[in-house]
């Protein structure tokens, strides 16, 4: 069983140097050994769905060998319980703000089946030919399903070798777009004036931005994102998108997706991108693979999937295609010259409607959202550790800020570009510190090269 990560001082304070003492070792210390932070964001899975049976994690309870996570099923008029699914493809459930409120059910975490409503879209009915393959042995909807090491062996192998985060929460109780806005800016909002950051108000129900771009409303996000601060500090970054990242007009034009705002690629919609002229830093997956091989990755990288390898429920390809995609990305970094100075963080943008038993903490009116899987993969990761700290995408921003920006926060009071965000989440006491997941004094771990299709 993996040991929990303790929130205590991990090393004794160093005594002051004395005359005649050996010289201190040269070279970077602590997080400054990390020159490359890489964030891979997949789609729509809850923690219990992927890691609910992982030993030592805060997962699904079992009684007499059977899952005890049973909730009301209004269609069958009885309680339905979790079940192990060996499927590759899933239906999932609604994953918007209304569904989140229903799922959480005031903290009881009992509304996941009720949120399905009725009909075939989410297989609430479960009797149609289309839905027959998406139900459990007792006719449970697949939002109650969980997978194990057998179905996603590489993800579990990364958890065994590195760090599994069992209190990673989606940043908001919404879907892909607000989650990715939080990923790069710490906020999700709509703005009355794209040139006035103070005109923005919190909004986690946003529609696809490219529908607005089609009518010339660009840019549309006026508040400050992390790339603006990276630019001010001369820190390199890249946001790597895949074909299919943008699925609405005008993205039907070949080659337009990377520079058109979309749910998984919001940066082109930020005013700051035009103020700093950084549009060319939005690249494609081939660019990431080349840079990882040649040792030219930027300091900060985000990698988001296309439709077919996203793990999104309802995709024509399933979770193993997504796992293969992620494994190829990780393998490329591990085989390249930058592995020794890299940290790869893997997460999923929202819960996809799947059951999770942990009530999300309330931090502000925008979240947190439901729990999602999280992993750290790095030669300096505390091997075989489960991190029980409370985390969200804000912890990614905090680590970027601490490593590359001297601790400068996305704080409108201090970052030189005021906006109207209600909270600066990186400063909240509840938020854990990703730096505690590393052991920089231990011998760095060698690469763990995995078969993408085991």
Predicted segments with their positions:
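Bacterial N-terminal signal peptides
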Residues: 2-11
């Amino acid at each position: 069983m993996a040991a929990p990560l303790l929130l205590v001082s991990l090393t004794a304070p160093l005594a002051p140097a004395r005359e005649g003492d050996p010289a201190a070792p040269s070279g970077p210390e602590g997080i400054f050994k990390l020159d490359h932070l890489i964030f891979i964001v997949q789609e729509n899975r809850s923690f219990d769905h992927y890691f609910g049976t992982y030993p030592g994690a805060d997962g699904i309870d079992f009684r007499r060998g059977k899952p005890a996570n049973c909730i009301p099923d209004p269609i069958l008029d009885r309680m339905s319980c979790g079940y192990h699914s060996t499927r590759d493809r899933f239906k999932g459930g609604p994953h918007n703000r209304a569904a989140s409120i229903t799922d959480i059910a005031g903290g009881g975490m009992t509304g996941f089946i009720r949120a399905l409503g009725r009909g075939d879209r989410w297989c609430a009915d479960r009797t149609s030919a289309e839905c027959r393959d998406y139900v459990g042995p007792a006719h449970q909807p697949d939002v109650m399903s969980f997978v194990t090491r057998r179905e996603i062996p590489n993800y579990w192998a990364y958890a065994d070798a590195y760090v599994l985060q069992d209190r990673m929460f989606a940043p908001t109780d919404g879907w892909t777009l607000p989650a990715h806005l939080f990923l790069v800016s710490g906020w999700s909002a709509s703005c009355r004036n794209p040139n006035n950051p103070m005109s923005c108000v919190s909004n986690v129900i946003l529609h696809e931005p490219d529908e607005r771009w089609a009518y010339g409303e660009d840019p549309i996000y006026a508040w400050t994102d992390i790339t603006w601060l990276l630019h001010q500090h001369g820190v390199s970054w890249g946001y790597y998108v895949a074909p299919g990242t943008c699925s609405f007009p005008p993205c039907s034009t070949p080659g337009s997706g990377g520079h058109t705002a979309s749910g998984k690629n919001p940066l082109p919609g930020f005013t700051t991108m035009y103020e700093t002229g950084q549009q060319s830093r939005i690249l494609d997956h081939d660019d990431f693979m080349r840079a990882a091989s040649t040792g030219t990755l930027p300091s900060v990288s985000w990698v988001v999937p296309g439709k077919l390898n996203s793990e999104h429920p309802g995709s024509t390809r399933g979770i193993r295609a997504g796992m293969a995609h992620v494994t190829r990305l990780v393998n490329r970094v591990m085989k390249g010259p930058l592995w020794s100075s890299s940290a790869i963080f893997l997460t999923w943008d929202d819960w996809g409607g799947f059951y999770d038993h942990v009530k999300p903490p309330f931090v502000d009116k925008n979240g947190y959202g439901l729990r999602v899987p999280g992993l750290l993969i790095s030669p300096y990761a505390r091997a075989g550790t489960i991190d029980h700290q409370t985390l969200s995408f804000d912890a990614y921003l905090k680590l970027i800020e601490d490593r590359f920006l001297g601790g400068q926060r996305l704080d409108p009071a201090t970052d030189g570009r005021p906006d109207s965000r209600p909270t600066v989440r990186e400063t909240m006491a509840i938020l854990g510190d990703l730096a505690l997941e590393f052991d920089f004094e231990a011998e760095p771990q060698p690469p763990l090269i995995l078969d993408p299709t085991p």
